[in-house]
Amino acid sequence: MKCLLYLCLWCYCVLVSSSIVLICNGGHEYYECGGACDNVCADLHIQNKTNCPIINIRCNDKCYCEDGYARDVNGKCIPIKDCPKIRSRRSIGIPVDKKCCTGPNEHYDEEKVSCPPETCISLVAKFSCIDSPPPSPGCSCNSGYLRLNLTSPCIPICDCPQMQHSPDCQ
């Protein structure tokens, strides 16, 4: 019996009935065919495992946080109640203006759209944007840049993990 070791996920596998079962460490559980979204603290106000705007075009064999847990900035599943509170400047009455867009490779946009998100996953995922909120002022990435997640800085598209083997980025 041969078993594979997935060091990049800090997981291990066992052979069960001639199929590989992934065992996840920590507060995770394994789904043989899961959705595209996981619970991530920084994104819970927009999407989660049960409210995912990404339309699956294939099954995702990966570790997901257990119900009631979400990934923190280090990728560790923590109780959702322990996630830092995400408060947008608009929600606390501070207007978003050009001075607020101080991150590298970003600019102020009067009509920023939220769907599809300007994140790396949008390069390979289909989004259902039918019920997305109307455009609103905010900070957008410059052309040729995306974010790893909704709260990270803008990076060159070729730095997105999804573009790792793209001939356009060699």
Curated annotation (Swiss-Prot):
Keywords: Disulfide bond, Glycoprotein, Metalloenzyme inhibitor, Metalloprotease inhibitor, Protease inhibitor, Signal. One of its GO terms (molecular function) is metalloendopeptidase inhibitor activity. One of its GO terms (biological process) is wound healing. The record marks S88, R89 as: Cleavage. Residues 1-19 form the signal peptide. Gene3D superfamilies: Laminin (2.10.25.10). GO terms for cellular component: extracellular space. Disulfide bonds: none annotated. Pfam families: TIL. Glycans are attached at N48, N149. Cleaved. It comes from the Eukaryota. Inhibits thermolysin, bacillolysin and pseudolysin, B.polymyxa metalloprotease and human MMP1 and MMP3. No activity on trypsin or cysteine protease papain. This is Inducible metalloproteinase inhibitor protein.
